[in-house]
Amino acid sequence: SLLPTFVLIFEKREMDILEVAKRNQQRAWEVIMDTDIIRIWEGIGAEVNLVGSLSTGLLMRHRDIDFHIYSFPLEISDSFRAMSELAENPSIKKIECVNLLHTVEACVEWHAWYQDRENKLWQIDMIHLLKGSRYDGYFEQVAKRLLEVMTEEIRRTILTLKYETPDTEHIMGVEYYQAVIQGGVRNY
């Protein structure tokens, strides 16, 4: 019978997926520590919150680290000062800024690309928000709710879907969570 072989292969694949997730999450924390990003933003008086896949333990292959950073008042000069300090790190290869202060989002979007010791690029998204604005705490609450309902089966399913998604597809983390939790999706 092929069943024992199939079960063995399936269990190894599942362990591999969990190992990939664990390794990438460890690498993400190395990036955070090497850049000193939290201290940099706190140095301008901002509150720094990790959001996204890393905050929920669901970071897989997409090397992306997300922060929501809150200031009141939000002075664009302070935002640039923090990013100027971050840019001094030689592993930061590129930085982009989108000024959305005069929109309903009331934020400055920063995207930085960090090259790790294996020459892999990590995208660091830093959304600098006006404390008390429309999206203050929104994604932190999404992560909290996700962690409240996430079982080991849901976690493995989300990680598997993220692992199996082709690199050419761009699916937001929240779309995976909704598909699995609300839609019952179990495979790619």
Predicted segments with their positions:
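Short, charged/polar surface micro-motifs in flexible loops or helix N-caps
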Residues: 72-77, 119-120, 131-134
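Short amphipathic alpha-helices in soluble, non-transmembrane regions
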Residues: 79-87
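Helical scaffold of the NTase/Pol beta-like nucleotidyltransferase catalytic core
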Residues: 6-51
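P-loop/Walker A phosphate-binding loop and immediately adjacent motor/lid segment at beta-alpha junctions
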Residues: 24-26, 30, 85, 101-107
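Catalytic cores of NTP-dependent nucleotidyl/adenyl transfer enzymes across multiple folds
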Residues: 124-188
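Active-site nucleotide-donor binding segment shared across nucleotidyl transfer reactions
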Residues: 37-80
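Conserved catalytic core of two-metal-ion nucleotidyltransferases
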Residues: 90-130
